[in-house]
Amino acid sequence: MELETHLSKYFTLAFTHKSMSLEMREKLAINSSATLKEFLQTIKNHCPNIKECMVLSTCNRFEIYASLRHGAHANEQKSALLKILAQNKKMSVSDLEKCVLMNTDESAVHHVFSVCSSLDSLVVGETQITGQMKNAYKFAFEEKFCSKDLTRLLHFAFKCAAKVRNLTGISKQGVSISSVAVKEALNIFEKERIKDKKALVIGLGEMAQLVIKHLLNKQFEALILGRNAAKFEDFIKELEEPKKVSFQNIENLNAYINEYELLFCATSSPHFIVQNSMLKETIFRRFWFDLAVPRNIEKPVLDNIFLYSVDDLEPMVKENVGNRQESRTKAYEIVGLATMEFYQWIQSLEVEPLIKDLRELARISAQKELQKALKKRYVPKEYESNIEKILHNAFNTFLHHPTIALKKNAQKEESDVLVGAIKNLFNLDKSNANHAQNLNLYKCEYYEE
């Protein structure tokens, strides 16, 4: 009988701003729950060797995190997933192959921890990615595409990200895509000598809200075009100067699109919100920032409109992160240590229940024999308590060395064979299954002392 490893085989596929153009990232982007669920279901239906799966889709990356079944080959899963992506997104496998980064086992864990800690972001240290990963995990968990393996990985990643933020201060230096866009807008405002510090913001999602807050900090006024007036009312309660922000339904876009010199657009729409058919000639130059993926603004045909995409802002981001190198080095040390601790913890997960089961088996056996002796009056009833203590001390002493040896060997690759052999010898497979059933999958079992 083959013993299945208790260590999960983690696997990641990543398409990021480092390896893939904005045009290609747009094709991969998933912006609706229905589309995401359909995509994950396709993976589940066509990739039987993938146990658990989740997808992270943001403006700068499209990533698949998975755990593989025992004996599955990572390259085979990669090929299968690229075929699914190619068919689903109407792209070629060869184009995807050129841009994809695959990681397995420890390198996959290190990658997930780095992404969650914002070390792989366009803007190093931005905290938005952690929230995006939490949402991606929560969706996959609630839709039953991920379970124990990814729960453990992601919760440990969230702990790692918190440690990176707390110990390095990498998130306190105030650089984000939204802040860089507003900073560039301020530079334009000063160079162009624009009279009114006003901006048009299309959208009311997380990115758009960050833009609005940065604009207000720079003493701008903002008109927001959106679909949800109630959401706007809730949002302005967070603002120190709510009177500087007003709201109109996005259906009125045509009435405002040619009135503002500064425009920021960040919605989850898969189509162009701002189209050339809406544009009119103006005597002033216009500066537009499209912070969405897929892009929300069609490439303008008018010469006096200057459009900045997410990728256009990358050089400006790099100018702002030079002083983060020391924090980044420290952060990678934390991620490396967390990766090692994660695997040590995972390796111990099978040993701890086994030790508990062995002790419980010894206790039950001793109690059973004691009750027999009492029933046959081999020992007086009044000695029962003292005999229980003697038996308890006896099996604790007997199991002391095996317990130490099991914990020590948990760190070795051959621990799977040892654990499996002990389970078979003592018929403990069934009892260990109960531990899995009682596991709270929505809460990681790992707690730091």
Swiss-Prot record:
GO terms for biological process: protoporphyrinogen IX biosynthetic process. InterPro entries: 4pyrrol_synth_GluRdtase, 4pyrrol_synth_GluRdtase_dimer, 4pyrrol_synth_GluRdtase_N, GluRdtase_CS, GluRdtase_dimer_dom_sf, GluRdtase_N_sf, NAD(P)-bd_dom_sf, Shikm_DH/Glu-tRNA_Rdtase. Its EC number is 1.2.1.70. The record marks 111 as: Important for activity. The active site is at residue 59. It catalyses: (S)-4-amino-5-oxopentanoate + tRNA(Glu) + NADP(+) = L-glutamyl-tRNA(Glu) + NADPH + H(+). It is an enzyme of class 1 (oxidoreductase). Coiled coil: none annotated. It comes from the Bacteria. Keywords: NADP, Oxidoreductase, Porphyrin biosynthesis. PROSITE patterns: GLUTR (PS00747). Disulfide bonds: none annotated. Belongs to the glutamyl-tRNA reductase family. Possesses an unusual extended V-shaped dimeric structure with each monomer consisting of three distinct domains arranged along a curved 'spinal' alpha-helix. The N-terminal catalytic domain specifically recognizes the glutamate moiety of the substrate. The second domain is the NADPH-binding domain, and the third C-terminal domain is responsible for dimerization. This is Glutamyl-tRNA reductase.
